[in-house]
Amino acid sequence: MNMTATELRKPVVAVQRAVQILRYLGGSQRPVGVNEVARALDIVPSTCQHILKTLDYDGLVSEDKVAKKYQLGPTLLRFARDMVGSNDFVRNAQGVLDRIAQVHQVTTVAVWREGTDRIIVVAKANAPTNFSIHVNIGSRFPALTSAIGHCFAAAADLDPDYLREPFEELNWQNPPDFDAWLNDVAFARENGYAVDTGQHIGGVTVVAAAIHEAVSNGVSGSTRAIGGVGLSEQLKGKGLNALAQDLKSSAAALSELYSESLV
């Protein structure tokens, strides 16, 4: 039976709730009970328990049988390892990150947007120096964070009024005002890369470029990006510009791989 576009977009409630539960457990940083999960996610407790039992059976969560509490399970580690080893984008991006890290002496990352409001680090390369900025694979951030956020906002080309609320929820060490941030987004749209000089994290410069792909019916968008991270005192002038241009051209090359269809 062929499904309509509307039916394909409609989420399967049970699957959606299972994903919500996994995300909640991942963010809790401690084992939690059924009732706490049910209250937090507004799920009927008996339904929540059935989902947790199923996830536990498949190793996606782990139950403390004595305390009757749940946490993420070991199967997710295997999934993560398999994803890093087999995902087409991660493989293609890793070589790019390794080269840029070596050439420009910076830590490099590739991120993938998770849903509409978060990004997750899916690949990285460390700077070949005694001191470098450390980033973990699997780290999650708000989608509009730092220079990478400038790129995603620029690619989405959304109304500024729509962007104001998520912007105000961001955590900055040296926060820009909204108009200045919009100027940074416009810069990213016009130049193909973005720069955050110590706003998100004081003393740290982040340079990023979006990877554009066909997201729906041939319409271009961006759910992935690459970036370089270094100390602001070291990453400036010609070195900063060289990194920006390298990220821009590398992102463009990766974009060509994903411009025709989703991968």
Where would I find each of the regions flagged by the language model?
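Cysteine/selenocysteine-centered motifs that mediate thiol-based redox chemistry or coordinate metal-sulfur cofactors
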Residues: 163-166, 170, 251-263
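Short, structured helix-loop boundary elements
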Residues: 11-15, 69, 73, 86, ...
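Amphipathic alpha-helical effector-binding/dimerization core
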Residues: 67-166
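A structural signal for short hydrophobic beta-strand segments in well-ordered beta-sheet cores
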Residues: 61-63, 110-111, 211
